[in-house]
């Protein structure tokens, strides 16, 4: 389960399992490491993997990606849930970058096993939320590229029933190999040069160049 800090990943796990894992507030995540939560759903043994949020106040997105990639190197998944707050009135550039990074992490071959789950439907009126969902579905820099390759968009209303329905969606699927797993394990690539790592590195390099240019301009002004 991936997504930005405060999207509701841990709350979702609590809804499914009936546990009471600590939940952070919107600006600070309680999940600082990979956390596996095991439970039974009917006769099936299920493992939900809680991950630190992108946009965390204490970790960079590159650090979060490194933690996730390290865990994925030895794990085959049945599916991936990416959570997004429908209450967000706009999508910032860093968040759009993370959508692109997430797409590259998964690759396009197994996106039928990816669910984009929108949360916080109780925090905004339905008409506004429905309009935002349509924007997320149709935006070329949002989720449209993944949906075009058979990813699914689902709603989570914060209830245990809906959370369990979302988990059940994945229980009929086989395990898969993600693009980043293939690149790290089979192709022996280092994380920064994988397709997912390159998305984050490109933005970091551009930020660094802007900082250097700004520093040079300030130095000229001081002289």
Residue ranges and their predicted role:
Residues 1-29, 59, 63, 109-112, ...:
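C-terminal non-catalytic interaction/localization modules
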Residues 52-59:
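Short acidic, Gly/Ser-rich segments with clustered Asp/Glu that frequently serve as metal-coordination loops
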